[in-house]
């Protein structure tokens, strides 16, 4: 919902009930592509189904039966999934095969309204290509919790891009998560 832009406008005193100047997208009945179907991918699918999203999963190591048990549809070809998804959520390890997996060619194959979320590992998305894609309106937006260089370099152009929401690799920063981790 472009929360970062709304927040910025309200702080500037631009409180408008009809803020139609800021583009927003919703989750309801949209298509999400989950790349990587481990513990986090399985947790995410439950939330997506709550919004009646069409869920596609790309994970060459997980069977179609397992994915269908969770309510998803397995796809065999990442490129096919990228072309149709409204949201792309990455949940894979960084390896030689996954480094820069999402580059300019993959970004250019996506919908202009697509949003990418990466909470797995930095380096899976080519950050320069992502920044260019956002600036050129190749895709709509991104949410990143991980970066190729952590902490993120001060000269990283993503820091100045208002089409991306950034957080500091902070999945475990909630009080509830810290509590669970202390007993597991």
Task: Annotate the PLM regions.
Residues 157-174:
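Short FAD-binding loop at a beta-strand-to-alpha-helix junction that anchors the flavin cofactor
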Residues 170-184:
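A conserved FAD-binding loop/helix module that cradles the flavin
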Residues 25-28, 49, 108-109, 158:
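Short, flexible hinge/linker loops that cap or flank conserved catalytic cores
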Residues 62-157:
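Rossmann-like adenosine-cofactor binding region
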Residues 37-38:
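Glycine-rich Rossmann-fold phosphate-binding loop(s) that bind the pyrophosphate
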